[in-house]
Every structure is written in structure tokens, then in C-alpha cells.
Curated annotation (Swiss-Prot):
PTM annotation, UniProt: In response to low blood pressure, the enzyme renin/REN cleaves angiotensinogen to produce angiotensin-1. Angiotensin-1 is a substrate of ACE (angiotensin converting enzyme) that removes a dipeptide to yield the physiologically active peptide angiotensin-2. Angiotensin-1 and angiotensin-2 can be further processed to generate angiotensin-3, angiotensin-4. Angiotensin 1-9 is cleaved from angiotensin-1 by ACE2 and can be further processed by ACE to produce angiotensin 1-7, angiotensin 1-5 and angiotensin 1-4.
Superkingdom, natural source: Eukaryota
Lineage: Eukaryota, Metazoa, Chordata, Craniata, Vertebrata
Organism the protein comes from: Equus caballus
A cellular component term, taken from the record's GO annotations: extracellular region
Subcellular location: Secreted
Name of the protein described by the UniProt record: Angiotensinogen
Length: 14
């Protein structure tokens, strides 16, 4: 649940 949404980081910062 982050403001910084990335294609890969989407799973990391769930």
C-alpha cells in the first residue's frame, strides 16, 4: 500500500 507503485515493486509493496 504505497504511493510509489512499480510494475515489479507492486508485489513487494503490497
Amino acid at each position: 500500500d504505497r504511493v510509489y507503485i512499480h510494475p515489479f515493486h507492486l508485489l513487494v509493496y503490497s
